[in-house]
Amino acid sequence: MSSQSSILVDFRPLATSFTGKYGSIQYCVRAVLERPQVPDQSVRRELQVVSHVDVNTPPLLTPMLKTQEKMVGCWLFTSGPVSLSVKIERKGYCNGEAIPIYAEIENCSSRLVVPKAAIFQTQTYLASGKTKTVRHMVANVRGNHIGSGSTDTWNGKMLKIPPVTPSILDCCIIRVYIHIPGAKKLMLELPLVIGTIPYSGFGRRNSSMASQFSMDMCWLALALPEQPEAPPNYADVVSEEEFSRHIPPYPQPSACDGEACYSMFACIQEFRFQPPPLYSESHAQLFCLQPVGPTNRAHF
């Protein structure tokens, strides 16, 4: 015998399922079959809950930047300062993404230093008024040695995020530090959120598409015909002497109706060798051809 039933789940924000060294976050469904005079029977099934973290929200798109300087040595035995400036493009990333790190390191001390960057995951357990914190490294990258009086620049040095649990209350950080032999490390920490909804780059893609569209439309301006220029004046091109020299003799017609024929011939002679009219956009006229005779019109 089998039956189906449903329950109403409260979809308020829930923390992502997690299992750690000193505690865990688990969700389960437990069903109990109660019968009179018979022991109850129960079954339990675990539910995997993932609280989605969208890295496209404005707080997680904010760039992170920090700068710090440390004097190497103490008292009268100082050897000079070491400065570090670090920036990442945004605060939120997802599993599998590579974080480009931009850093400037200046070594004004007399010692050899080595810059490093790492991702640390921090787990904090609270129970019975006591707190237990566990921090472990999940990824790291190392730079080149920097000698005394030298500088080094990271122009997007990649630090790839391995498969880790999505952040619960911003529990991850990026730690960039400089190992200085014989002295304490110069360390910077930038907050990092591991999300579940990857970065879409919507705004940047729109701007690139708009620039590409404007570039693609450049050919249209080249293909459009230029504004036509007015033709030159006929008198400037053909002189009066050349004009009279090229007029062929026209004999008088033998058979003509008299005045009508003469007037028509005079009209032809009058306009045959006249220069074309000057072109002017302000006096341009549109000519329409109209049908002669009755037309049929349909009404709908």
UniProtKB/Swiss-Prot annotation:
Subunit annotation: Interacts with ADRB2. Interacts (via PPxY motifs) with ITCH, NEDD4L and WWP2. Interacts with AVPR2. Identified in a complex containing at least ARRDC4, AVPR2 and HGS. Interacts with SLC11A2; controls the incorporation of SLC11A2 into extracellular vesicles through an ubiquitination-dependent mechanism. Interacts with TRIM65.
Known role: Functions as an adapter recruiting ubiquitin-protein ligases to their specific substrates. Plays a role in endocytosis of activated G protein-coupled receptors (GPCRs) Through an ubiquitination-dependent mechanism also plays a role in the incorporation of SLC11A2 into extracellular vesicles. May play a role in glucose uptake. Participates in innate immune response by promoting IFIH1/MDA5 activation through interaction with TRIM65.
MF (Gene Ontology): ubiquitin-like ligase-substrate adaptor activity
Pfam families: Arrestin_C (PF02752), Arrestin_N (PF00339)
Coiled-coil region list: none
Family named by the database record: Belongs to the arrestin family.
Organism: Rattus norvegicus (Rat)
Database matches in SUPFAM superfamilies: E set domains (SSF81296)
Sorted UniProt keywords: Cell membrane, Cytoplasmic vesicle, Endosome, Membrane, Repeat
Lineage, broadest ranks: Eukaryota, Metazoa, Chordata, Craniata, Vertebrata
PANTHER family on file: ARRESTIN DOMAIN CONTAINING PROTEIN, ARRESTIN DOMAIN-CONTAINING PROTEIN 4
Protein name as annotated: Arrestin domain-containing protein 4
